[in-house]
């Protein structure tokens, strides 16, 4: 039932998916996986009261279930309950200190709340774990700008562009920072490249030119692909669709 529910969800049939999840829970009320899956579906429908009930139940059944804590943190975030969000993310990191996905999200929330030094520490750890994480460089650069550490920001934008040469928003931001440093000729060059990248993107994506002209669409939900929660024995459905359901916070995009 859980697998068929996942298949229905993949096909966009949420009614049949929820029906199968309900059946799975009825058959085994002590398996947290059914509650987590149903709760995530409720959250996608913005039925947060029901979603929270399911996630609470999953955690009650398995107090070390980091995937449930992580998903509940996202639900708290959507409801702007930031202390509760941080509490659950911290709980994940108690069990899994090297969970890059959780560190990344916690770093972005620290930045949103103005705790820039804490944000830098989290993003530093993310990049130690996954040096190829484009958005971690991009967002850390934005934090450096807030701290007026402009040369550090330029270096992080350089790295983001090296990893993703079509990242127009990174070119644009780098142009802005170089202008602040008085490097006007370099700033103009970076700006011109950004405009060219945007034009190329629009030419290839005519129907979607307005919403993602900065070319960040490819990375809007990409963070690390090393399946931090795999050891919790959730099957491939949970991990495969994680990037869709997590909707990572790219606060400086």
Please provide the spans of the model-predicted regions.
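Alpha-helical tetratricopeptide repeat
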Residues: 1-253
């Amino acid at each position: 039932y859980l697998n068929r529910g996942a298949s229905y969800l993949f096909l966009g049939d949420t009614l049949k998916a929820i029906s199968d999840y309900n059946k799975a829970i009825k058959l085994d009320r002590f398996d947290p996986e059914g509650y987590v899956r149903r709760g995530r579906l409720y959250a996608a429908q913005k039925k947060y009261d029901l979603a929270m009930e399911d996630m609470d139940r999953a955690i009650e059944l398995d107090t070390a279930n980091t995937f449930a804590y992580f998903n509940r943190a996202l639900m708290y975030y959507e409801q702007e309950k930031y202390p509760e969000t941080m509490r659950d993310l911290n709980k994940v990191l108690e069990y899994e200190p090297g969970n890059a996905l959780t560190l990344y999200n916690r770093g972005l929330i620290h930045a949103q709340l103005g705790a820039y030094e804490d944000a830098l520490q989290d993003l530093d750890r993310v990049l130690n774990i996954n040096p190829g994480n484009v958005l971690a460089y991009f967002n850390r650069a934005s934090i450096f700008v807030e701290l007026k550490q402009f040369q550090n920001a330029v270096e992080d934008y350089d790295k983001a562009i090296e990893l993703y040469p079509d990242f127009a928003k990174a070119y644009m931001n780098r142009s802005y920072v170089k202008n602040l440093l008085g490097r006007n000729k370099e700033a103009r060059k970076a700006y011109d490249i950004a405009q060219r990248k945007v034009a190329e993107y629009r030419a290839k994506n005519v129907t979607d030119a307005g919403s993602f002209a900065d070319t960040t669409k490819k990375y809007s939900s990409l963070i690390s692909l090393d399946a931090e929660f795999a050891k919790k024995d959730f099957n491939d459905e949970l991990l495969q669709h994680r990037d869709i359901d997590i909707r990572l916070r790219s606060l400086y995009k």
